[in-house]
A protein has these predicted regions:
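Asp-box/BNR beta-propeller blade signature and adjacent active/binding-site loops
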Residues: 80, 106, 255-256
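Conserved radical SAM core fold
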Residues: 84, 122-123, 159-161, 249-255
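Metal-dependent catalytic neighborhoods of phosphoester/phosphodiester hydrolases
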Residues: 90-99, 127-130, 290-292
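Active-site acidic/histidine proton-transfer and metal-coordination neighborhood
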Residues: 16-26, 37-41, 99-115, 120-219, ...
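Glycine-rich, proline-tolerant flexible connector loops at the mouths of alpha/beta enzymes
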Residues: 82-102, 157-160
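Conserved beta-strand positions in the central sheet of alpha/beta enzyme cores
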Residues: 81, 115-117, 153, 247, ...
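Generic detector of well-ordered alpha-helical packing
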Residues: 82, 122, 195, 222-224, ...
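Histidine-acidic metal/acid-base catalytic patches
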Residues: 2-28, 32-76, 200-307
């Protein structure tokens, strides 16, 4: 009898049956299991480092991205998230030679490259300047594809947009982000908009822009430290379904007060949502990142053991 392996594989994926077990099931495959979809608590977390944690040293030229790769390997991170600012020549994209050297070194150190990001402002009323930012994002989408990076992080923006309403800003921002997402689709790279306490301040703001763009190639870079009105954990719960990557910071803001993050509470929210992917860590403020990052990493690892 001729075996339709394509159909068989489709059913195995659908019902989650492993190949060795499925080989002996025969006609039983026609009976769907009680739960054909993964349960809500199926999750997989991979710890990455957002390179902004080393911003001061990188800006000063004391270290470079290759030094941060070594640091990530020494501390057994799963991945690195190198923001575009730290590549040579930014806002221009890095050369092929640099891209290939960076990819090679990350691979040899056992590190994924989980994301990158640019500095843009889609709140800017001037369409010429916004068009330039869209062009920059699309160039970095292509660079991300060359680097094997699955997403490019963008901001909403900080411009005061005098003379224009928030509704107007949302309209032109949605169109600009759609253009970026269309380019991302061509290159297999998602656009991750970050809630950065800029134009996007609340979970409702995030919901609104994602609904308006309505693209499978747009997701949320969920920044836990940038919900600064009310209860951040409630805001995170409202937006977690949109998250495709994160910025896990030491502190959150509870009713306007900076407070150490409750990582156990946070990771239970993320786990309950069934999130699977990278959790990039980012330290901010004064202090030595060679001390601060390992401390944050240890706190995160301890919290993950409790969920």
């Amino acid at each position: 009898m001729m075996v339709n392996y394509r159909e068989k594989r489709r059913m195995l994926i659908k019902y989650g049956v492993s190949l060795p077990v499925a080989a002996g099931l025969g006609s039983l495959l026609s009976v769907p299991p009680a739960r054909a979809q993964p349960p809500n608590d199926v999750h997989k977390f991979k710890i990455s480092l957002n390179v902004y944690s080393f911003n001061r040293l990188l800006r000063a030229g004391t270290i470079d991205l290759f030094d941060v790769l070594t640091f990530c390997a020494e501390h057994n991170f799963d991945a690195i998230d190198p923001t575009g600012y730290y590549f040579p020549g930014y806002p221009d994209v890095p050369s092929d030679e640099y891209v290939n050297r960076f990819k090679r070194q990350a691979f040899l150190l056992g590190l994924d490259i989980s994301g990158t990001g640019v500095r843009n402002d889609f709140v800017q009323p001037d369409p010429v300047q916004r068009k330039a930012d869209v062009a920059m994002v699309t160039q970095w989408v292509e660079a991300a594809a060359r680097l094997g990076i699955p997403n490019v992080r963008v901001f909403a923006g900080t411009h005061k947009h005098e003379g224009y309403s928030r509704d107007q800003v949302f309209e032109w921002m949605a169109q600009d982000i759609k253009t970026c997402c269309q380019h991302g689709k061509e290159y297999g790279v998602m656009v991750a908009i970050q809630n950065h306490n800029d134009f996007l301040k609340t979970a409702a703001d995030v919901d609104r822009i994602l609904t308006m763009v309505d693209s499978d190639w747009l997701g949320l870079n969920l920044d836990i430290g940038s919900y600064r009105q009310g209860d951040p954990y409630q805001e995170i719960e409202k937006n977690v379904r949109h998250a495709i990557t994160w910025q896990i910071k030491e502190n959150v803001w509870v009713n306007g007060q900076e407070t150490p993050a409750d990582f156990v509470k946070l990771f239970r929210i993320i786990k309950k949502a069934g999130y699977r992917g990278y959790l990039p860590l980012e330290t901010l403020g004064e202090g030595d990142p060679y001390e601060k990052v390992p401390r944050l990493l240890e706190n995160v690892r301890q919290a993950l053991q409790q969920i």
